[in-house]
Curated annotation (Swiss-Prot):
BP term (GO), one: rejection of self pollen
Matches recorded under InterPro entries: Self-incomp_S1 (IPR010264)
Cell compartments where the protein resides: Secreted
Organism listed in the record: Arabidopsis thaliana (Mouse-ear cress)
Domain of life per record: Eukaryota
Segment forming the signal sequence: 1-30
Record protein name field: S-protein homolog 12
Similarity comment: family membership: Belongs to the plant self-incompatibility (S1) protein family.
Key words, A-Z: Secreted, Self-incompatibility, Signal
Gene Ontology CC terms, in alphabetical order: extracellular region
């Protein structure tokens, strides 16, 4: 009498629900997906449409030097974006997967950049290069971009 007990049906499930809730809160950080037009030459316009299960971003148009980015939270599993890219050089249909693994591949914890160039669709990776002076008492780092071709125009 007077003791508060958790009902037996919730005892194990309550702990499981609590753990899943904590994991979802700690694993849903903000993230950006960026599409950048770096086409050169006469035919430089990029037209694309991207959508996910929850959102349709519609058709967009970028000229060289322009970019578009979307911010969202990565779920505990994966967030899938599908995009149709159209240029005078060809077209690419690509599934852009926003996941924890892709964040590692991009080299940036907050943003993944997809770059459209004359020969295809690239994923921009950021590498950190460390420097120090000859005495070793001053250190600094520089972020270097490196584009990896993921899909050629068809």
């Amino acid at each position: 009498m007077g003791t508060n007990k958790i009902p037996k049906t919730l005892n194990g499930n309550l702990v499981l629900i609590l753990i899943i809730t904590i994991m979802m809160v700690t694993h849903s950080h903000g993230f950006q997906l960026e599409i950048r037009n770096e086409l050169s030459g006469r035919y430089r316009k990029l037209v694309y449409k991207c959508w996910s299960r929850d959102n349709d971003f519609g058709w967009r148009q970028n000229w060289p030097g322009q970019y578009k980015d979307w911010s969202f939270a990565i779920s505990l599993f994966h967030t899938y974006f599908y995009c149709h890219f159209r240029t005078a050089y060809g077209r690419v249909d690509k599934q852009l997967v926003a996941s924890w693994e892709l964040k590692q591949e991009c080299g940036d914890r907050r943003k993944c950049t997809w770059v459209v160039k004359k020969d295809g669709l690239y994923l921009r990776q950021w590498k950190t290069k460390f420097f120090s002076n000859k005495y070793g008492n001053e250190r600094w780092n520089v972020y270097i971009e490196h584009d990896v071709l993921k899909k050629s125009w068809s």
